Design a protein with these regions (language model features):
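Surface-exposed loop/turn motifs in large extracellular/passenger domains
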Residues: 27-44, 49-71, 77-98, 104-126, ...
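Gram-negative bacterial Sec-dependent N-terminal signal peptides
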Residues: 1-27
Length: 142
């Protein structure tokens, strides 16, 4: 009978592990993030970075003569929507790639209502208040 109890316990443990071992990934929006970059960054910087969701109402500020050796995105979505994001560039050094208010990398997500404010500094590639690498519309950005 002792072996039966051990087998039952092991069966219950195996069942629990099987039910919880898989990772369920759901689309998750990134909203309301505020990020200030005041020291130079070696890579791309983000206000909100949504891997599989929308980037909504995020803010990125680059201040105190900080340089960025990549791009600066206030709202970045890999495949959904990027709306209402704000990029502020004040007293900065150089952004060596692009400065983007809102950006959707692929898919049909809308890019709207994003803003870029630039007081001083240099952007080597491009400045876009809102753009997309996908098929969605980019409208109402400034």
């Amino acid at each position: 009978m002792k072996n039966g109890k051990v087998f039952l316990r092991l069966s219950v443990i195996a069942l629990l592990l099987a039910c919880t071992s898989g990772t369920i990934v759901q689309a998750e929006d990134v909203s309301g993030k505020v990020n200030e970059v005041s020291e130079s960054a070696e890579d791309t910087v983000y206000g909100g970075n949504a891997v599989d969701g929308s980037a909504l109402n995020n803010q990125l500020s680059i201040t105190k003569e900080a340089s960025v050796n990549g791009s600066a995105y206030s709202g970045y979505s890999s495949n959904r929507e990027a709306s209402g994001n704000t990029l502020k560039i004040t007293r900065t050094g150089t952004i060596y790639e692009s400065a983007e208010g809102g950006y959707v990398n692929s898919g049909s997500g809308a890019v709207s209502g994003n803003k870029v404010f630039m007081e001083s500094g240099e952007v080597v590639q491009s400045i876009n208040s809102g753009s997309t690498g996908g098929s969605g519309d980019a409208t109402g950005n400034s």
